[in-house]
A protein has these predicted regions:
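N-terminal export signals
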Residues: 2-5, 16-36
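Short, structured active-site-proximal loop/turn typified by the sulfatase FGly-forming signature C/S-X-P-X-R
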Residues: 73-104, 109-113, 169-171, 193-199
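Beta-strand elements within well-structured catalytic alpha/beta cores of enzymes
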Residues: 51-63, 82-83, 92, 106-108, ...
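Histidine-centered active-site microenvironments of extracellular/periplasmic hydrolases
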Residues: 75, 182-191, 269-274, 279, ...
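C-terminal cap/loop subdomain of S1 sulfatases and analogous C-terminal strand-loop tails that border
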Residues: 193-194, 198-204, 320-325, 333-338, ...
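Formylglycine-dependent
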Residues: 122-169, 177-257, 263-272
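Long, internal low-complexity/basic segments
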Residues: 3, 8-10, 24, 41-52, ...
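A short beta-strand-to-alpha-helix junction
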Residues: 49-50, 72-77, 94-98, 146-157, ...
Length: 529
């Protein structure tokens, strides 16, 4: 049940599931309706200063139960909790169950399986995953271990491209994880006008390097500004906050901006943390540092006069690594139990969301794609159909959610094919009623074979929409680069090579069978279509 009501004027179009939008859509902001057929130049001239800025903050591997408003220690998340009290909190907000698929869905408004990002994110070195995918650890023709190139397809339209076309300044500050090697896969080729942070799936918070799951001393530097490696001292969580402050300070009220701020916090390895460890565990201290960063960003928006006209969103990319931090939900990251895919989400938009309200309508992270375009007065038409639905009615006028289905996984990945339709979720051979049993304690498949049959048929229908994989992914060349970004690696600075060589000298020459240098989530039960 939706528990709040807003007074926005006008009527919003609703997106048809798996269909592209009609040629026009009504975008609402500041109480006004805008014609989306306006050209980019006309939009920029007519609407500059009136359209909402959009700031999207994404944490990494935070558990459902870690924010204070969800039962966590309020000492660790005062700024997140303050944002929750100032904004709208969603209780049925969903993501994919791991990093890269979630980011791909957010960027494109499409399920990750549609561009194989659910598979590509797993093809680079986790031995148990590779076995399921019929792959081996990547080696070049000379037998030197390397990585397969995996990235978001270049024919995908990103939210950054859509908002840039609509006249927004666009920036990514933090973790990209949608392609780290070929130039055409990097953020500034995908619609972002400013880039800062790291390209790949994780980074040491101080060294800015990442060891990969390969049987070699494979350590790569991964810290960049506008596609150039940069040398910076400090803790990445703090650095991302500082860069965001600088970017906000450079904005003006004549041009709206979209800031995508995907932190690597609180993803492992969490070993060294700059403060709070005298009182808290390293993980808790890292969470509190992230909360500090979110507070700095909110304060910067206020300081520079943007807060009242900014749609500020906080959420997380997937469930936490342990069930303890996902309570009361079952499951973890890398599973499609609720604990792996239900994420905390807060939305604050002064004048459009009411402080301290809660909405239990179903929403998927891909829905931000269409929602943002509507708010921006952008163009919905595109070649590839989207799965994203326009949520402005639910978020800003108290309407029921237009979403009643989420496809979390189809066949072909290492996780269990899973679909939620209405109250029911089919997860392989398991069936749960999420409305009456949100903690997934009781499998009711045997009692409801008709529902199982119907959901399996729907899942198979969607599964058939996965495109052919195509050619086997290319390998990185050279096999052991110093820095991500093929052009950045052509002539890396000496300080960078020395730093990488120093760390490589401490790495084992090979990993023991089945082992990897990064912690992995527990395995999910096996299921199939």
């Amino acid at each position: 049940m939706n528990l709040y009501l807003f007074s926005w004027e006008g009527k919003m179009n609703r997106r048809q599931f798996l269909k592209s939008t009609a040629t026009t859509a009504t975008a609402l902001f500041a109480g006004c309706a805008v014609n989306n057929n306006s050209t980019t130049n006309r939009i920029g001239k007519k609407l500059a200063g009136s359209r909402a800025n959009i700031v999207f903050i994404l944490s990494d591997d935070m558990g459902w139960a870690e924010p204070g408003f969800n039962g966590g220690n309020p000492e660790l998340t005062p700024n997140i909790d303050r944002l929750a009290s100032d904004g709208l909190r969603l209780t049925q907000f969903y993501t994919h169950s791991v990093c890269s698929p979630t980011r791909a869905a957010f960027l494109t408004g499409r399920y990750a399986f549609r561009n194989w990002m659910d598979w590509r994110s797993e093809d680079f070195g986790k031995p148990s995953y590779l076995e399921k995918l019929g792959l081996t650890l990547a080696h070049n023709d000379e037998g030197v271990p390397t990585r397969r190139i995996h990235a978001l397809d270049t024919n995908e339209r990103t939210i950054a491209e859509a908002l840039k076309e609509a006249g927004y300044f666009t920036a990514i500050i933090g973790k990209w994880h949608a392609g780290e090697w070929l130039k055409e896969h990097l953020p500034m080729q995908r619609g972002f006008m400013h880039q800062y942070g790291h390209y790949a799936w994780g980074v040491d918070y101080y060294d800015k390097t990442i060891p990969h799951n390969a049987p070699a001393r494979f350590v790569v530097y991964d810290w960049h500004r506008n596609e150039q490696p940069i040398r910076e001292e400090g803790y990445t969580t703090d650095l991302i906050a500082a860069e965001t402050e600088r970017v906000i300070a450079r904005q003006n009220k004549e041009k709206p901006f979209f800031l995508y701020i995907p932190f690597n916090a609180v993803h492992g390895p969490v070993v060294r943390v700059p403060r709070y460890t005298d009182k808290y565990t390293p993980r808790e201290a890292a969470l509190k540092c992230f909360d500090d960063a979110l507070g700095r960003i909110a304060a910067a928006l206020e300081k520079h006069g943007f807060a009242d006209n900014t749609l500020l969103i906080f959420t997380n990319d997937n469930g936490g690594l342990t069930e303890e931090i996902n309570k009361p939900y079952r499951g973890t990251k890398n599973t499609t139990f609720e604990g792996g895919v239900r994420a905390p989400c807060i939305i604050r938009w002064p004048g459009h969301t009411q402080p301290g309200t809660v909405n239990d309508g179903m929403m998927f992270i891909a829905d931000f794609f269409t929602t943002f375009i509507s708010i921006a007065g952008g163009r919905h038409e595109q070649e590839l159909p989207v799965d994203s639905l326009d949520m402005t009615g639910m978020l800003c006028r108290g309407e029921s959610s237009p979403r009643d289905e989420i496809v979390f996984e189809v066949s072909g990945s290492v996780r269990i094919p899973t679909i939620r339709k209405g109250d029911y979720k089919l997860m392989g051979k398991l069936l749960y009623n999420i409305k009456t049993d949100p903690y997934e304690t009781t499998d009711i498949a045997a009692r409801h074979p008709d529902i199982v049959k119907r959901l399996r048929a729907r899942l198979m229908e969607v599964d058939a929409e996965r495109p052919p994989l195509g050619d086997k992914p290319l390998l990185m060349e050279p096999p052991l680069p110093y820095v991500y970004g093929i052009e950045e690696n052509e002539n890396p600075p000496e300080w960078l090579k020395e730093a990488v060589d120093r760390i490589r000298a401490t790495q084992p020459k090979e990993w023991a069978p089945g082992e990897t240098p990064w912690p992995q989530a527990p395995k999910a039960p096996v299921g199939s279509l």
